Amino acid sequence: MATTSTTGSTLLQPLSNAVQLPIDQVNFVVCQLFALLAAIWFRTYLHSSKTSSFIRHVVATLLGLYLALFCFGWYALHFLVQSGISYCIMIIIGVENMHNYCFVFALGYLTVCQVTRVYIFDYGQYSADFSGPMMIITQKITSLACEIHDGMFRKDEELTSSQRDLAVRRMPSLLEYLSYNCNFMGILAGPLCSYKDYITFIEGRSYHITQSGENGKEETQYERTEPSPNTAVVQKLLVCGLSLLFHLTICTTLPVEYNIDEHFQATASWPTKIIYLYISLLAARPKYYFAWTLADAINNAAGFGFRGYDENGAARWDLISNLRIQQIEMSTSFKMFLDNWNIQTALWLKRVCYERTSFSPTIQTFILSAIWHGVYPGYYLTFLTGVLMTLAARAMRNNFRHYFIEPSQLKLFYDVITWIVTQVAISYTVVPFVLLSIKPSLTFYSSWYYCLHILGILVLLLLPVKKTQRRKNTHENIQLSQSKKFDEGENSLGQNSFSTTNNVCNQNQEIASRHSSLKQ
């Protein structure tokens, strides 16, 4: 069980005792529920049509800092220190190199805090520790630094279409910066959002319809009627309730640690081991579903997260959603799983690492992901194994998938087999992420004779490398897309995807372009 101590408030200790959950977890859930109510109040009484952006920034920031103080006590000062020093770097260093200095400092400061928490305070504990919010703030600092660098230093023709859309053309004020990093909607569990999307929301420009004018510049034509987020919020709260119920009732009866139990290893058959591995890791996911979906609901309740309308005219509130549960559980490829899990972190990795490095971007991206997650050895085992599995899965797909496209019965057979293989491979890969320590992780892999590691290496050694046209034409396509968008003056404000079109196909293309580079 997680630690029962906390650096934050002990006001809810009686409730913690009553529900038999650690006080830090109770503080987190109660503060998120408070944030949900505050979000409804924020949207109702501090709507952009009723008050100024300044007031909205101030209230969002103060509420966020209060929640941080309640949950983490004086450790919440780390949020201000990390944010404050990073802002000074942005001002002093200048736009040419600020993104590099901010990246090194923010990630370094996060790592130091993670080391002290893990090796000094509570090694191996799953608690709502103060480094959790710092992980989100680190994402925001580094993302914003890159966006400012793109908008104020690099030439437009050097940018990809997504970089141009997100580029920040002026230095944020200190209040805007702190509001972006520490607002109450995302201070505890995120998710990450782009600076432009956040400022657009605060300033009430989320529902503006824009169209290219004759002079090639965007002209606001009219303001769309603001849709209600109530249905989306209720649906997400239902998912939260089911996820929490599943976690509290099922997860404890199917511990991942049982995979390395000596008696289980000695007596269980291989089919039993495989089935239990899958079920135990399946049972470990609902706590993430709960936390991320609740965070998404909070932002939606405040009016943030609207992406546009689908083909049926229904409002889409998934601009900053962090996962798609159905796609995760039905994934038929490693890529499909990763595309739908921790989506905003995947976008961050793509934007600050994958798109900006020329040498082994896949490997460097996995390494950055491991460093960002923390200093437990299990994280590094998971992400190094993930590199191998990703490359092997890509090779298998490129060499064999085209044989199973037709007829439909063969395609169905292929989907069933790849679903089974994907779920087992994902479970096998992430066991160290849950076990954390090196010894139990290696014990697990040894009990499986490192079979998937060996199989992955053999796949890479034996299967021919089939180069796809996608990577070959990436630069060419980017330039064509940039030229077209620059000539038409599309999306110069870098707002949400719905700002330029209601066409669902175009929206899906934008989503695909944001995810595909990291996962392929």
UniProtKB/Swiss-Prot annotation:
Membrane topology per record: Multi-pass membrane protein
GO molecular function, one term: 1-acylglycerol-3-phosphate O-acyltransferase activity
Compartments it resides in: Endoplasmic reticulum membrane
GO cellular component: endoplasmic reticulum membrane; membrane
Positions annotated as active site in the UniProt record: 342, 373
Group of enzyme by EC: transferase
Disulfide bonds: none
Stated name of the protein: Membrane-bound glycerophospholipid O-acyltransferase 2
Transmembrane regions: 22-42, 61-81, 88-108, 184-204, 237-257, 264-284, 366-386, 416-436, 444-464
UniProt record similarity statement: Belongs to the membrane-bound acyltransferase family.
Organism: Homo sapiens
